[in-house]
Structures are given as C-alpha cells and as structure tokens.
C-alpha cells in the first residue's frame, strides 16, 4: 500500500510554517541582548558614557536600575554558549575568560528621564543564558578569584 504524497507535503508545509517563527524569536532575543549589553569599542567608560549609552539604547523609559555593557566582539560573547563557557547554576553559562565590562547603576531619584548613572568599569567573568547557541539574557558578572 503506497502513501500518497499529499499528507507528506502537508507535513512539510506545516513544518515550514512552524519552524521559522521559532528561529525568528531566538534571533530577536539575541538582537535584544546585543542592544542591551554589547558595545564593542566604548568611547570612555565613565558616568557620561553610561548616561549616553543608556539613552541611545532606549533603556531610560523608565530609568533601568542596572545594566552591564560587555566590550568585545560578538563571536567571543557568543562562544560563552559553547567552548568559551562553562555550565553555571540552572541553565546559565559562565565565561571561561574575563571580559572588559562597564556596569551602569541608576543613582536614584525619579525613574523618569533624564536618568543619571554611575559607571563601574573592570574585567569580569560574565554569566549569561543561552538559547540555541545564542546569548539571550545577561545574568551577572564578577571578578575572578
């Protein structure tokens, strides 16, 4: 008994409809991660840098309490999800090597713009969440012991 190509074609078409939105969702979460946490070549890493970057990246409506920018190339950050990372706690990855980072902390006051931030710069290991080999959430950073 031969199966007609109709049902197989229907399964194939349904697969095309279901898979791309999932991949697009992963890509949009990765893009959001990069917008919020990646700055390859920072110009200054002081309080003004934080105020400028937080505003430029639309993280000031309302003023975000804390945000960390990772300085380095995207492929090295992405590699934390693979060879440059180790499992850490539940579903997280910790970088094997430290990254140059700038953490911006809201100095208080109104949660409405203009937002004022204090910068803290250093080399730290970063902890991120990954989905399908892409970073999608920044969890924390800390100095190596």
UniProtKB/Swiss-Prot annotation:
UniProt keyword annotation of Metal-binding present: no
Any GO molecular function: RNA binding
Gene Ontology CC annotations of this record: angiogenin-PRI complex; basement membrane; cytoplasm; cytoplasmic stress granule; endocytic vesicle; extracellular region; extracellular space; growth cone
Cysteine disulfide links: 50-104, 63-115, 81-130
Activity regulation behaviour: Has weak tRNA ribonuclease activity by itself due to partial autoinhibition by its C-terminus (residues 139-145), which folds into a short alpha-helix that partially occludes the substrate-binding site. In absence of stress, the ribonuclease activity is inhibited by RNH1 in the cytoplasm. In response to stress, dissociates from RNH1 in the cytoplasm and associates with cytoplasmic ribosomes with vacant A-sites: ribosomes directly activate the tRNA ribonuclease activity of ANG by refolding the C-terminal alpha-helix.
Positions annotated as active site in the UniProt record: 37, 137
Keyword Nuclease: yes
Record text on subunit structure and interactions: Homodimer. Interacts with RNH1; inhibiting ANG ribonuclease activity. Interacts with PCNA.
Protein name, as recorded: Angiogenin
Encoding gene, per UniProt annotation: Ang
């Amino acid at each position: 008994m031969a199966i007609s190509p109709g049902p197989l074609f229907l399964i194939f078409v349904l697969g095309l409809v279901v898979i791309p939105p999932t991949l697009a969702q992963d890509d949009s979460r990765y893009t959001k991660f990069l917008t919020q946490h990646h700055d390859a070549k920072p110009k200054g890493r002081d309080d003004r840098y934080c105020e400028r970057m937080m505003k430029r990246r639309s993280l000031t409506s309302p003023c975000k309490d804390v945000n960390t920018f990772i300085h380095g190339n995207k492929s090295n950050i992405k590699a934390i999800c693979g060879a440059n990372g180790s499992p850490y706690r539940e579903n997280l990855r910790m970088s094997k090597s430290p990254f140059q980072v700038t953490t911006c902390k809201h100095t208080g006051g109104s949660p409405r713009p203009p937002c004022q931030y204090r910068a803290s710069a250093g080399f730290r290991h970063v902890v991120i969440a990954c989905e399908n080999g892409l970073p999608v959430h920044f969890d924390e950073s800390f100095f190596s012991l």
